[in-house]
Each structure stands twice: as C-alpha cells, then as structure tokens.
C-alpha cells in the first residue's frame, strides 16, 4: 500500500488545529503518504451531556457509558465532531470521508467490563479493508472511536487505543498523537527520541507531568510488532520540515552506537 501514517487527534485539539497542520497533511499526501485519522471528542460529549442534564461519572479515568451516555457519545462522535473535522479537511483541499468504527465492521470489540464501565469496549479485531479502499482512492478516512460487538451492539472505545489498533491493522509506518505542544520538553528543549524506559524516568523526575502522562503512556503502549514508531507532535503549528517530522519520537529501543 505504500507509506501509511495514522494520526490520533484528541477532542480538545480538533477545533484548534492550525492551517500549517492541514498544509502538512496536504504535503504528505502529495509526496505519496496515505493518511487515516482517528479522533476523540471528550470535551464535546461532556458539554452535550450537561446541556441535556444527563449525569455521568468516571471510573479509573474512563467515562462510565450508560445507554443514555452512549446515545450522546454516538451523536457527538459520529455526528457533530466527525463532520466538523471532515469539513475542515475539505476546506483545506483534502478529500475526506467520515466514518465510525461501526462502518464496514471496522472495529469489532467485546465489553471491557460491563458492570464497571457500561457500554465500553475492548477492541478485538480491526477490519482494515474499508479504510484501505478509501485511502487507495485518495480519500482520508476520519474515524470516530465507536465499535460493534459480534451481536451488533454499539460500544464506545478509547480513541488512543482505537488509533493504535487501526495503525497496527494498516501496518502503518508511523502513528502520530496530535497534541497542543510540539513534543516533550526538558529545560526548554524538545526531546527528539525516547524509549519506554526514558519515559518512566522523566515521569519520575517530574519532567513529564499532568495531561502529558496519559498521552505518553498511550504512545508507549501503541508500540507493537506492527507499529515500531510513534510520535507526539503539535496540531497548533507545523510538524513537518522538508527532511523530517518535528516532534518527540517514541521507539522500542535506541540503536546501539558502534
């Protein structure tokens, strides 16, 4: 399939993506990269739940998804935020198709723990053919993190884990976690390359803190036999130069220097 890159954009960054970000995507497609996007939508879901007076709670950092919460999550993820993202891509000259993990049986899942988390899934299989077909025709699939069980029940899935699973199924060359910072910083300098061991040391030192901790843990867990390189990049500026990507690269291990 040529070179493939998967981007994961969190719900908090989608509405703040810069023109440079979209131009970078265009540059990548023009140089032969095939692109898939997976997005979240947490802040928009929270706003809509408040608007509709639907109570929600978090268990171990994960939103408990009752049937009422799932209806809202699907409305936001497959509806408003997905179509907003598609429109932004189209506006910047990037042909995009909005889908959810339910379409084409893209994401198949089992219940994570119905008693504790409700309608939340653990991805067990990715059917990448639909996404591959769209990319082969020059479209960017924009994927909302919803899934179906074997019995066709809808389950919400963590967007980071969905992006990781999609990247593995597509055998992507790179998986990019798009954030509001250009990478992981230490003493005002961006760290270019980290291993999982480096990440744990930097967390212990307090260099990586707050909202960046779950991001780096997701990036670290995304490293698999199929996905050997994950990057944390900015959606608020350029993440691409003529020669390379700008961001912090997370790899399994550094090559030995002979």
From Swiss-Prot:
The record marks 8, 215 as: Transition state stabilizer. It catalyses: N-acetyl-L-glutamate + ATP = N-acetyl-L-glutamyl 5-phosphate + ADP. It comes from the Bacteria. GO terms for cellular component: cytoplasm. It is found in: Cytoplasm. GO terms for biological process: arginine biosynthetic process via ornithine; L-arginine biosynthetic process. Its EC number is 2.7.2.8. GO terms for molecular function: acetylglutamate kinase activity; ATP binding. Its main location: cytoplasm. Pathway: Amino-acid biosynthesis; L-arginine biosynthesis; N(2)-acetyl-L-ornithine from L-glutamate: step 2/4. Belongs to the acetylglutamate kinase family. ArgB subfamily. Catalyzes the ATP-dependent phosphorylation of N-acetyl-L-glutamate. This is Acetylglutamate kinase.
């Amino acid at each position: 399939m040529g070179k493939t890159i998967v981007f994961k954009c969190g719900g908090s960054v989608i509405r703040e993506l810069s023109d440079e970000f979209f131009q970078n995507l265009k540059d990548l497609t023009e140089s032969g990269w095939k692109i898939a996007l997976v997005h979240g939508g947490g802040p928009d879901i929270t706003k809509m739940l408040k608007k509709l007076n639907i109570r929600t709670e978090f268990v171990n950092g994960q939103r408990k998804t009752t049937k009422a919460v799932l209806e809202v999550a699907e409305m936001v993820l497959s509806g408003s935020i997905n179509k907003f993202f598609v429109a932004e891509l189209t506006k910047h000259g990037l042909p995009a198709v909005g889908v959810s993990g339910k379409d084409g049986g893209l994401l198949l899942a089992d219940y994570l723990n119905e008693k504790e988390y409700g309608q939340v899934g653990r991805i067990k299989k990715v059917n990448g053919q639909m996404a591959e077909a769209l990319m082969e025709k020059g479209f960017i699939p924009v994927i909302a993190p919803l899934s179906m069980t074997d019995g066709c029940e809808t389950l919400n899935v963590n967007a980071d884990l969905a992006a990781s699973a999609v990247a593995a199924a597509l055998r992507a060359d790179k998986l990019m976690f798009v954030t509001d910072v250009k990478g992981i910083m230490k003493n005002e300098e961006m760290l270019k390359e980290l291993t999982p061991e480096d990440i744990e040391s930097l967390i212990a030192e307090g260099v990586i803190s707050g909202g960046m901790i779950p991001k780096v843990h997701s990036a670290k867990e995304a490293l698999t036999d199929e996905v050997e390189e994950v990057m944390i990049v900015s959606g608020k500026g350029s993440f691409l130069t003529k020669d390379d990507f700008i961001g912090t690269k997370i790899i399994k291990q550094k090559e030995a220097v002979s």
